[in-house]
Amino acid sequence: MDRNSVTGLALIALIMIVWLQFMSPDKKSVQPDNRPKAQTTATVSQEKTEAPAALRSDTFGVFAEASTGAEELVTVDNELFTMTLSSKGATIKSVVLKNHLDGQLKPFDLVSSHDKGALSLLFLNVEGKKIDTRELYFRLVSQEKKQTLSGKKIAVVRYRLDINPQQAIDIVYRFSGNSYKVDYDVKLTGFDNALAGNEYQLQWDGGLAYSEKNREDESHNALAGAFLGGSLVKIDASKENQTYREEQSGEAGWVAVRNKYFVAALIPGSKTEGIYLEGKKGSGHFEEYLASLKMSVPSTEKVASNHFSLYIGPLDYNTVKTLDANLEKIMDFGWDWLTRPFAEYVILPVFTWMNGFISNYGLIIIIFALLIKLVTYPLSMASTKSMKKMAALQPMLKELQEKYKDNPAKLQSELGRIYKEAGVNPLGGCLPVVLQMPLLFAMFYVFRSSIQLRHHGFLWAKDLSVPDSILDFGFSIPVYGDHIAVFPILMGVTVFIQQKITPTTQSNDQMKMMLYIFPVTMLLFFNNLPAGLGLYYLMFNVFSVAQQFYINSTTSTDDVPKAALEAASAAVASKKKKGSSKK
C-alpha cells in the first residue's frame, strides 16, 4: 500500500462514516390509516368473553358468536423449529428456532406479540365492522395437539370458523419435517359481496422479537418490507412517537418483517391487490412492524381460495434464495449496482464453498484475505514500481513545477512527456485501492449482517459478528465506544508498519502526519465493527506487509528509464538557462 493508497483508504473510511451517519433509508411520511385496523385491546380475558351479547354484536356483527370460546393450542415440532398455533384466530403464537440461540446463547421466541399472536386475516365487512380474526375462536379440525416430524414427513393443522350456514373461513397449515417454509391456505365461503372493497388482508403484526445483546444495533436492521413490481419497498421506524406507513397497489412478490438476523415473510401464490406496511418505535429501541398482503375476493365467486407460503427463520442467503421469491432482496448489501454483486457473486459463494471443508469461519476469513491479496498482487506490484519511479523523479519534478509555476500548460506538457518516457502513471498508486473499494464496502455489509458469522468464535473473539471486546468500560467514549477490541488495535499496528516500508512521493511533513493519523483513524473506525471484519483487514494488512517486503527486495529505482531522467534534467536545465539569459 503506497501513500496514495493510504490517502485513498482514509477517504474510504471517511465516506463510510458519513454513509453510516447520513445515508439511512428515506423515512416515509405519516399518512392517514384508511385500512381496517386490528383490535388494540390485549387478549380477551375470560370475563370479556362473557360480555353481554348486545356488546359483542355491536363490536363483531355477524361474527359475534365466534368472539367467545375456549382457546386450544397445537404444537408442531420439526427439525428446525417448534411452532405453537392457537385456535383463537388460527394464528401463530410462538416460533422457537432450534439451531439459533439469542445473544445470551439461550432459546428465544421470534413472535413478539405472544398474547394475540402474529398472523391473521383483516377485513371490513358490509356492516362496517372491522374484523381481525385473532379476536375470533376457530374450531380445530385436526385431532392431534402435538405433532413431531422430520425429514420429508408432512403435518397438517386445520381450522374452521362457521359464521352461519352460508359463510365459513377455513385455514390450513402444512409443515415439512426439514424446512422453515410453511404452506398456508385460506378459503372464504360465502364472502362474495360480503366484504367492503371485496378484499381482505393477510397480515403479520408485531414485527419480530429482538435476539441480540446490542438492541440499538439490532434496531438499525429492523424493518418492514415488500417486493412490489420488481422493486424493494421498505419502511424503517427510526423515530419514537411517530408512525410510518406505506401503502401501494400492485402485484407483490412478498411482504416481510425482519430484525438483524431473522425474517418472517408472507409469499402469495396468486395475484395480490397491493401491500400495506406500518411501523413505530417503542421503548428500549424496539421497533414494532406490521406487513400485509391485500387479496381480492371476487363478487362472482361463492368460494375464494388463496395459497401462501410462510417463511419464518434465519436470514441465510442460500436458504432464502431457494424459495425463488426474491426474498433475498430484503438483505442489505449496499448499492445494487456496485456492492451487491460483489456480495452475492463473490463473497458469499466463496465463503459457502470454503465452509464445505473448513468449519471455522475465522480460518475462512484468513484464507479469503489471502486469496484477495493474491488476486490483487499484480496491481500492487505495478503500483509499487510506479511509486519507486515517481520517487526517483520527484526531486526534478518538484524543481520543474517551481520553474513552470507561471506556465501551467507548459508544465503539464513537460510532465506528460516525462511520465510517458518513464512509464509511470501519477495515479497508479491509487489504482489498487480504487479497484478494491466495491469489495471493501461489500465486505462491510456482509460481515455486518451475515448470520454465518453469528456465534462463531476465533481465538479470543467469542462471536465474529460483534466486536471482539476484551474490556467493557460501562460508559461510552465519543467516537471510540464503550469497549476495547483487540483486532482493530493489531490492525492499526500493521497499518503503521506497512506505511513505514512503503515507497512515498509525499513530503516528510505529510508522511509523518499520515504515519500516525491513519492507523489511529482505522482503530477508531473498526473498534465498533464486527470482529470478522477486523480480522479480515488485520490479516489483509499482514499479507500486505509481507508482500511489500518482497516487492521492495525485487524492485529498485534503477527501473526508471534513462531517457526519462535525461528529459527531466533537460527540462529543468532549459528553464534555468532561459532564466539566466533574461538577466
UniProtKB/Swiss-Prot annotation:
Pfam families assigned to the protein according to its UniProt record, in alphabetical order: 60KD_IMP, YidC_periplas
Biased amino acid composition, Polar residues: 37-46
Molecular function terms from GO: membrane insertase activity
Subcellular location: Cell inner membrane
Predominant cellular place of this UniProt entry's protein: membrane
This protein's UniProt keywords: Cell inner membrane, Cell membrane, Chaperone, Membrane, Protein transport, Transmembrane, Transmembrane helix, Transport
GO biological process, one term: protein transport
Transmembrane region(s): 5-25, 341-361, 362-382, 427-447, 477-497, 515-535
Domain of life according to the entry: Bacteria
Gene3D superfamilies per UniProt: 2.70.98.90
UniProt topology in membrane: Multi-pass membrane protein
Region Disordered, annotated ranges: 28-50
GO CC annotation: plasma membrane
Subunit structure: Interacts with the Sec translocase complex via SecD. Specifically interacts with transmembrane segments of nascent integral membrane proteins during membrane integration.
Record-stated family: Belongs to the OXA1/ALB3/YidC family. Type 1 subfamily.
Described function: Required for the insertion and/or proper folding and/or complex formation of integral membrane proteins into the membrane. Involved in integration of membrane proteins that insert both dependently and independently of the Sec translocase complex, as well as at least some lipoproteins. Aids folding of multispanning membrane proteins.
Stated name of the protein: Membrane protein insertase YidC
Phylogenetic classification of the source organism: Bacteria, Pseudomonadati, Chlorobiota, Chlorobiia, Chlorobiales
Gene responsible for this protein: yidC
